[in-house]
Amino acid sequence: MTDDATTPMMAQYLEIKSRYPGSILFYRMGDFFEMFFDDATAAAEALDIALTKRGMHQGQPIQMCGVPVHASEGYLLTLIRKGFRVAIAEQMEDPAEAKKRGHKAVVRRDVVRLVTPGTLTEESLLEPRRNSYLCAVAEVRDEIALAWTDISTGELRVMASSLLRIGPDLARLAPREVLLSEARSQPLAELVAECGAALTPLSRGNFDSTSAERRLCVLFGVGTLQAFGSFGRAEVAAMGALVDYLDLTQRGKLPLLQLPQRETVGGSMQIDAATRRNLEISAALSGGREGSLLAAMDRTVTAAGARLLERRLASPSLDLTLIQARLDAVRSLVDDGRLREQLREVLRQVPDMDRALSRLALDRGGPRDLSAIRNGLVQATRLSAQLGNLPDLLAAAVMALRGHDGLVGLLDQALVAEPPLLARDGGFVAAGHDADLDLTRQLRDEGRGVIADMQADYVAETGIPSLKIKHNNVLGYFVETTDNHAARMLAPPLSERFVHRQTTANQVRFTTAALSALETRILNAGNRALEIEKQHFETLRQAVLQQAGPVAAATRGLAELDLAAGLADLAVMDNWVEPVVDDSRAFDVTGGRHPVVERALHRQGGG
């Protein structure tokens, strides 16, 4: 078969695929994502799914495989973990809209997102208690810098580095993906490769510091980056590369990035990769979390608190003032056991607002993400009223929990207690929030009640007790009887009222003028109700995004409180003592115990 005989659908597929040669293309066809040619061969093997054929191209059968849209996240995660990148091409219009352009018109499709190891946001694709970092390493003349972000939380940080420090810096972050210029030096490339993350080469232009500065100023709405700190050219280039890559992978829908924070060289302890691995700080030598120092110390009850603990352990501070402030915070909750338990009890009810906010910003969120923001802020407000005289670190955290009454009130009034996952399912706007929606729902629901009455009337009229009114997506509503009643239904006088629609192996299906009219009424009301709910979802999403800064600050405050309370619980339950920390070189430990060994012995019943 020649290219001239390529079907319009396959021509569209090949055009989209040509723009993403390094990615597996998930091509939406109805309820499935289909893959073709080499993509199908690779994906079928990686996912352990059936490989089939569909038509011919250039004289060769077209390899094909597919996965259901509703289960696609699990398949995506498998592909990402096996080193693939995935371009997701969605249908940009309904088939009915395509038909208006002609009966041979193909439904418009385009890539809406490029899924890579460092750009995951879905709850099912992420580890709740760990950050998922995307890093960029820039080299400008003699400068080297590292920028990193977790787009699921919006964190954005940058620091100067060097050939000597880049290895330990990357080991500390354990990024999922690292961006590097195609023009990087060989020594730098070799050092970055050692971190084990997926490496993504970008063009030299993506690391241009001048264009990066302009882009960052526009993104953050400032005239100069000096408002956030004094950044070197390599630091600006690294941040710019991150933003460029996010723009590419998210197809123009940038995540809600926090204002950039610059980490100073010497602000935290440098630990090289080998030492970090041998110390088993965040992971045991086996690669798992169990058996690590992190597992032994983690008493946090929120996902954000757990992520903060891992960051603190991976990057021990060298700032004596900051260390003392953290110790003061823990001590205050060690001394007040009642407050500590009250605090932890409330925190257990706090959802992962960081990641809910990120999904809403990327337009991938649903009603449950709105509910997570509402429920989290309700608990934040509750805590702010309970917590009084606290050390400075915790007092600052509590301040961020206040001032959310307006948003909480709006979300509480608008949402049901337990919304569905997806906005398209409807049923998430609370009764009483919108009179028009309530009326439309009543019409829809009453129409469905009339169906039951109509079925009873038809049973009485025909004398067929087994007659049912059913619904499917092909025929809509229809009257169904078993085939042994077909002759009666197809003969006068019943045939004058019941119009034959379909005969199957064991059933015969009919419609009536009254049933068709009622179906139109029900469908119109149902569709109208769903459209109203979708409008409310967008209004609520925008209301949350307008308060994104204060909401993000509240999540950071809750994480700080959770971490302090968790460490205080550890100190009380396991009899840990507060260290005396000063700027001397003295290291004096009396009666020390190994936390990981002690935990292992307790779990084995030996300690």
Indicate residue ranges for each PLM-predicted region.
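Coiled-coil termination/hinge junctions
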Residues: D445-N473, A554-E560
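Alpha-helical coiled-coil heptad-repeat register
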Residues: M10, Q324, T381, R441-R444, ...
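Structured, non-catalytic alpha/beta "coupling" segments that mediate domain-domain communication
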Residues: Q91, L179, L191, R233-E280, ...
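Basic, polar low-complexity surface loops/patches
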Residues: M1-D335, D352-S358, L362, D425, ...
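Long, charged, glycine-rich C-terminal linkers/tails
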Residues: Q91, L254-E263, D457-K470, A568-G591
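Short His/Asp/Glu-rich catalytic/ion-coordination signatures at enzyme active sites or charged loops
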Residues: L362, E418-D436, Q507-F510, A514
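A conserved P-loop NTPase coupling/switch region
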Residues: F32-K53, A145, E155-R157, P168, ...
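Conserved NTPase motor "head" modules and their coupling/switch loops across ABC/AAA+ ATPases, GTPases
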Residues: D4-A5, R488, R497, T539, ...
